[in-house]
Amino acid sequence: MSQTPEQIIAIVPAAGIGSRMGAEIPKQYLQLNEQSILSHTLDCLLSHPDIDKVIVALNPADNYFAKLPQVKHPKLECVIGGKERADSVLSGLKIAEAGAWALVHDAARPCLTHRDIDKLIASVNEFPQGAILAAPVRDTMKRTDEKGLISETVCRERLWHALTPQYFPVSSLMQNLTDALAAGALITDEASAMEWAGVMPGIVSGRADNIKVTHPDDLQLASLFLKNAV
């Protein structure tokens, strides 16, 4: 029997400053093919027919978001984000319907496709606890010691690169994020909060070009992917 969420929302934590880019402005506002990285991300989410609402968590000192062309879209809402990603996600979850499901997506992943969103949403029937997009590890993985010397080769079997969106019921994600943070757990993404609570999220294989723009070289790569998008 298929499950149909009461509502599907997207949450975009966009309160960070992206210091590793070495740019003068937060990386989500850097230009990419004639509009900002965040604009590309929002365009994909706002245009998806199954997403009812897109909630963006912003830095309280943000002076850039109001200039985006998407700012007046009827499906868009904004909240004040926090210092950490998890705090921003919680801010978005707090204004969501209790029976909704949340797609949490990185602001700096502008190459997301509707096809991957469709696959993730459909996975609720196989993974009623929630799931994430991920890409299988293809390269040989090495672990180093504290001196930067290779100490071992890590078996890549069943290893995945975690991507976003990550898709969970609003009520359980909010509870587990809250509890994990209160316990001082290291939470790097939504799945890690669910794992901490004993939930085993599913994996949905996603496109490897759904990259996160983190370093300057990533901008050129994202530009190429967007130009060749099908």
UniProtKB/Swiss-Prot annotation:
GO biological process assignments: isopentenyl diphosphate biosynthetic process, methylerythritol 4-phosphate pathway
Pathway in which this enzyme or protein is active: Isoprenoid biosynthesis; isopentenyl diphosphate biosynthesis via DXP pathway; isopentenyl diphosphate from 1-deoxy-D-xylulose 5-phosphate: step 2/6
Reactions catalysed: 2-C-methyl-D-erythritol 4-phosphate + CTP + H(+) = 4-CDP-2-C-methyl-D-erythritol + diphosphate
UniProt keywords, alphabetically: Isoprene biosynthesis, Nucleotidyltransferase, Transferase
EC nos: 2.7.7.60
First-tier enzyme category under EC: transferase
Pfam families the record matches: IspD
Sites marked Transition state stabilizer: R20, K27
GO molecular function: 2-C-methyl-D-erythritol 4-phosphate cytidylyltransferase activity
Site (Positions MEP for the nucleophilic attack): R156, K212
InterPro entries with a match to the protein in the record: IspD (IPR001228), IspD/TarI (IPR034683), IspD/TarI_cytidylyltransf_bact (IPR050088), Nucleotide-diphossugar_trans (IPR029044)
Physiological role: Catalyzes the formation of 4-diphosphocytidyl-2-C-methyl-D-erythritol from CTP and 2-C-methyl-D-erythritol 4-phosphate (MEP).
Family under the similarity heading: Belongs to the IspD/TarI cytidylyltransferase family. IspD subfamily.
Matching HAMAP family: IspD
Name of protein: 2-C-methyl-D-erythritol 4-phosphate cytidylyltransferase
Organism, scientific name: Shewanella halifaxensis (strain HAW-EB4)
